[in-house]
């Protein structure tokens, strides 16, 4: 599937997914994949997280997720707020039995009512130093490759490999959380698709929606959990894997991968060679 790709062999898997082509959702031909990003400019890692499922599954997800939100006394799930008991969750005591039970329920809904999940993280400093200069000319006249955009592209490539295998005939509409830079990311995705990268084949469309969409909140949960673990790996803290992430990745169709300094150093010569051989990826001057 990666015969010609800007993203080939970029990272290593913390938890590799088993291909989902034989799973129960094989009969669902048109899916939706929801994508969110965790981490910011002040953090070690940037992580994109995504879940994919068919519309009937997402409808069941919405009912179950809404019930947990109602019991939590909140309207919208933001993982950072929930796990730190602030914002809409400020009335909950951190690590109280109520808090732990709600965490278990949110994770349970994400596990039961999705088909596959993907998270991909990048080491921010290493990306800025090693990869960003190589990608400076890639994109369109209005869209360049940000670290968030590159994490999203790689996350979607994993989704195509493991959740939407080419021989399955399944397709998906991609929904990103609305926010700064997402319009440019969508333009970049359309640009990559127009260039014919095979992993983009199952993706029918790219759009944004507000965080009020429940499936985007599940993507936020996976991005946050991936960000916590991948940051720990990058910083060498050696902490045990969080129970919430352990529960999420017990599902065999969840993939968590990353590219730190070592992985990006190995990837840089491939990327440089690829761009030299494929000048059509470069921005065209405005007329």
Regions from the language model: what does each represent?
Residues 1-287:
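Phosphate-ester processing/binding pockets and catalytic centers
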């Amino acid at each position: 599937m990666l015969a010609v790709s800007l993203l080939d062999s970029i990272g290593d898997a913390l938890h590799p997914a088993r291909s989902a082509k034989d799973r129960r959702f094989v009969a669902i031909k048109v899916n939706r994949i929801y994508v969110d990003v965790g981490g910011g400019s002040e953090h070690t890692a940037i992580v994109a997280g995504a879940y994919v499922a068919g519309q009937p599954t997402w409808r069941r997800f919405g009912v179950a997720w809404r019930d947990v939100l109602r019991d939590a006394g909140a309207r919208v799930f933001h993982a950072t707020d929930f796990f730190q008991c602030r914002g809409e969750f400020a009335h909950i005591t951190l690590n109280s039995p109520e808090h732990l039970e709600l965490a278990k329920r949110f994770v349970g809904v994400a596990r039961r009512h999705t088909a596959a999940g993907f998270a991909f993280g990048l080491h921010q400093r290493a990306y800025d130093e090693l990869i960003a200069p190589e990608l400076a000319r890639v994109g369109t006249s209005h869209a360049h490759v940000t670290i968030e955009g590159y994490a999203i592209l790689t996350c979607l490539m994993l989704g195509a490999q493991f959740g939407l295998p080419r021989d399955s005939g399944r397709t998906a509409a991609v929904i990103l959380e609305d926010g700064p830079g997402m319009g440019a990311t969508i333009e970049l995705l359309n640009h990559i698709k127009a260039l014919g990268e095979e992993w983009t084949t199952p993706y029918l469309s790219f759009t944004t929606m507000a965080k009020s969409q429940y499936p985007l909140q599940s993507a936020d949960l996976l991005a946050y959990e991936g960000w916590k673990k991948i940051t720990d790996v990058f910083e060498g803290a050696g902490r045990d894997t969080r129970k919430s992430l352990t529960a999420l990745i017990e599902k065999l169709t969840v993939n968590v991968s990353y590219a730190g300094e070592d992985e990006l150093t190995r990837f840089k010569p491939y990327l440089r060679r690829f761009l030299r051989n494929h000048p059509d990826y470069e921005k065209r001057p405005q007329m």
